[in-house]
Each structure stands twice: as C-alpha cells, then as structure tokens.
Swiss-Prot record:
Protein name per UniProt: Ribosome maturation factor RimM
Family: Belongs to the RimM family.
UniProt xrefs under Pfam families: PRC_RimM, RimM
Any single GO CC term annotated in Swiss-Prot or TrEMBL for this entry: cytoplasm
UniProt keywords, alphabetically: Chaperone, Cytoplasm, Ribosome biogenesis, rRNA processing
UniProt entry tagged with the keyword Membrane: no
Gene name tied to this protein: rimM
Single Gene Ontology BP annotation: ribosomal small subunit biogenesis
Main subcellular location: cytoplasm
Chain's role: An accessory protein needed during the final step in the assembly of 30S ribosomal subunit, possibly for assembly of the head region. Essential for efficient processing of 16S rRNA. May be needed both before and after RbfA during the maturation of 16S rRNA. It has affinity for free ribosomal 30S subunits but not for 70S ribosomes.
Amino acid sequence: MIKTLHELLKDKVPIAVLGKTHGLNGELRLFPLTNMPEVIESLEEVFIYNEKVKKLLIGRIIHMSLANGYYIVKFRGIDTLNDAKKFVGSTLYIEKSRLPILSSDEYYFYEVIGMKVYDEKGIFLGNIDEVIQTGSNDVFVINKDTKDEILIPVIKEYVLQIDKKSNKIVVKLPEWLD
C-alpha cells in the first residue's frame, strides 16, 4: 500500500531542524524545536523530512555534541560535506509516543498550535499559529483571518486556562492591547 506524506507523519512530531553543515565529515548543526534537552540528547533514530526533494528518510545518529545554542550531529551514511549539504533545512521527526509524559499544566508546542483562543469574556480572538521561545517565557502568536496577530506572553497572569480536551485556551488580554 502506498502512503501519502501526511499519513507517514501522522503520529510524528517535529523535534528539530538541521542547519548549516559543520566541518568536512558530514556533520550538521541541529536546532531543537523543544526546550527539553533530554529529548534531543536521547535521540538515536529519527525521521528526516527534506521539503526540497519531498523525501522522508530514517536517520541513525552516531554522534551528537552541544555547541552554542545548537547541537552538532553526525548521521550514519552522511560522511562528506556534499552529503551533508543535501540535508540542510530538513526537519527531524520522532514518534509522539517517544515524548516524555507531561504534567497537566505543561504542553508540547504541537498540542497548542491550532487551538482556539478566547478572552475572559468568551470573545474569540483567533487560533494559535506559532509559539515563540524568548528565553524568559514563551509567547503565543494568535491570528484570526488576515488581521493583525496578537502576541500573548505565556505566563499565569495572561494565560488563564489551556484545555487540551476542548482545544481551547482562555487568556487575559494585556493592558497594552486595549
């Protein structure tokens, strides 16, 4: 049976993006899409999706080391600079089942992307399009149709409720948005 890319990625979640090459022996920079280093550091086998060539491959990591805000990674079978260049910009995926179980007040980015956002009065503000990591706290990017985006800091003062079951988030709008 032939499966579509959507079907192949159904139970998988993006975990990192491959950046520029590093050195001459096929190493690449790996930029995590999670703030959980233990998930990245435990990776052994990943699904590599390259948008340019529309290919999904399985990659086995044989070496990884931490650098300045990213990792240097070496895959089996990628041994030259030219080999590595083919994977620049690729996204790494893992099975959702391999992610650590979170407490009820924690979430993975993929769980909140697309959620509906309402203010305290029940007015629909839009959907979560993106989660930005700022270092001090995450920020939800909310879009409704083509109007301006709303940025909400992910702190208790502004994010009042995240209900994964009903796909709904309730926020208090910051004063500067009034």
